[in-house]
Amino acid sequence: MSDDSSAGDADVDLPEGVERRTFGGRQRLSTRGAQVYGEPVDADGWRAWDAGRSKLGAMLELGMDTGLVGGESVLYLGAASGTTVSHVADFAGPTYAVEFAPRPVRDLVGVAEDRDNLFPLLKDARDPESYAHVVEAGIDCLVMDVATRGQATVAVRNRQFLADDGRLLMAVKARSEDVTAEPDDVFDDVVAELEPAYEILDTARLDRFHADHLGIVARPK
């Protein structure tokens, strides 16, 4: 699904380094950095952030209060080829990008060549001990876009990296958990599994941009 929206909730504070700018006659989220996936770039070097290709972009467009202010240290799980994490690295501090598939990681390494603060890791997010020696403690933000069964389990296992006042920004894909279940039932189960480890601050369906997805904002208990 591509981003066919105009501006989202303009009253929500965006992180420093994320702006709404005009592309093709409409307002879109943008960050400033090297082009990655053919997105429009304006004369000042700001590139459109396509919420239809980015769960975190969708969360921001829908007005979710992510708690992001800019400059955070970030652990990004499910980085794939770097579409979303490239935007994150444009406005964040040290950004650790975990992806388990070798082919996307090759693309991710190319994205990191233009971003000194982006560190690709060919690792499995289900096994955080495999990268615990690399990722710094007290991370400000854990971003999760992991399309696998057991998404809540992955979030709980990676809680160890978060600062006490850190944030979990998670996109839950219902069909990755159970293709036969109703998405709302899946989302309820995921939230229930998260609650012993996280305080849930906000949830929102992302269907305007991504069918059968739930955005979650939480902080560690």
List the model feature ranges, each with a label:
Residues 73, 93-94, 117, 167:
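Residues at the starts of beta-strands that form the adenosine-phosphate
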Residues 1-46:
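N-terminal auxiliary segments of SAM/dcSAM-dependent transferases
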